[in-house]
From Swiss-Prot:
Active site per database record: C51
Protein name, UniProt field: Peroxiredoxin-2C
Organism lineage: Eukaryota, Viridiplantae, Streptophyta, Embryophyta, Tracheophyta
UniProt KW keywords: Antioxidant, Cytoplasm, Oxidoreductase, Peroxidase, Redox-active center
Database matches in InterPro entries: PRX5-like, Redoxin, Thioredoxin-like_sf, Thioredoxin_domain
Single GO MF descriptor: thioredoxin peroxidase activity
Span of domain Thioredoxin: 4-162
Note: The active site is a conserved redox-active cysteine residue, the peroxidatic cysteine (C(P)), which makes the nucleophilic attack on the peroxide substrate. The peroxide oxidizes the C(P)-SH to cysteine sulfenic acid (C(P)-SOH), which then reacts with another cysteine residue, the resolving cysteine (C(R)), to form a disulfide bridge. The disulfide is subsequently reduced by an appropriate electron donor to complete the catalytic cycle. In this 1-Cys peroxiredoxin, no C(R) is present and C(P) instead forms a disulfide with a cysteine from another protein or with a small thiol molecule.
A Pfam family reported for this protein in Swiss-Prot or TrEMBL: Redoxin
Subcellular location(s) per record: Cytoplasm
Originating organism: Oryza sativa subsp. japonica
Gene: PRXIIC
Amino acid sequence: MAPVAVGDTLPDGQLGWFDGEDKLQQVSVHGLAAGKKVVLFGVPGAFTPTCSNQHVPGFINQAEQLKAKGVDDILLVSVNDPFVMKAWAKSYPENKHVKFLADGLGTYTKALGLELDLSEKGLGIRSRRFALLADNLKVTVANIEEGGQFTISGAEEILKAL
């Protein structure tokens, strides 16, 4: 399947997350993004070095600037279970705006055409690193990394595009 691209409609899918009352919920991507301008970014895995030290902190630190430029929500998706994503979210006590969403079976990542086979490293099927900007479900920016690179999918690149 071809990767999601500018002009595409974000596919719908169910993702897991813990709400403000610490209850596990299944949420629809369309329910989160319809009628809004959202950043949807994906990482290969929770607690991995580049994801934890650069990619996620970049969006947390730039969240206010993104919101000032019209972004309604910042959504992080990873092929991990909701409990791992909850623990990862708690490792960023300064986070006020990034929602940590779990794609436990990788079905949403596959619908985006962004799966990455890391079986040789013992990680199974994961997500390519990416950052999408979508306005009312239409993809307006699609910054998709090759391999393990981190060059175009950070918050700074999304800010430049706004």
